[in-house]
């Protein structure tokens, strides 16, 4: 196989974009010292990785898993969550069904304006000349 084309690999990996991602990841693995599964034949790492995929010496599913693992910053650990979380204010009290509803007070616009009139504006501080 003198030249590797996408058509040689497309039956192993359905999506061309995925093929490029997997081949690039495998080429980076080869650059970092991973063992080759075929002879190099004086080819560069991207060509070797495409040849490995075309000849099925590496599994695209394994490459996909390694790629996802290399891109993960945080590994999610499934831990069981508690069913109920106690409220901060009622540590010793029992939780009732009525406590879960939040009561909101409705305020009219006039009541809001009256409340705002009572607020004093912040004092202006004199500007300092330098």
UniProtKB/Swiss-Prot annotation:
Sorted alphabetically, which keywords does the UniProt record give?
Answer: DNA-directed RNA polymerase, Nucleotidyltransferase, Transcription, Transferase
Catalytic reaction equation(s): RNA(n) + a ribonucleoside 5'-triphosphate = RNA(n+1) + diphosphate
Q: Which GO terms describe its cellular component?
A: DNA-directed RNA polymerase complex
Pfam families hit by this protein? RNA_pol_Rpb6
Q: Which InterPro entries match?
A: DNA-dir_RNA_pol_omega, Pol_omega/Rpo6/RPB6, RPB6/omega-like_sf
Q: Which domain of life is it from?
A: Bacteria
The record's annotation in NCBIfam families points to: rpoZ
PANTHER family this protein is in?
Answer: DNA-DIRECTED RNA POLYMERASE SUBUNIT OMEGA (PTHR34476:SF1)
Instruction: Please describe what this protein does.
Output: Promotes RNA polymerase assembly. Latches the N- and C-terminal regions of the beta' subunit thereby facilitating its interaction with the beta and alpha subunits.
* Name of protein: DNA-directed RNA polymerase subunit omega
**Organism encoding this protein:** Rhodopseudomonas palustris (strain BisB5)
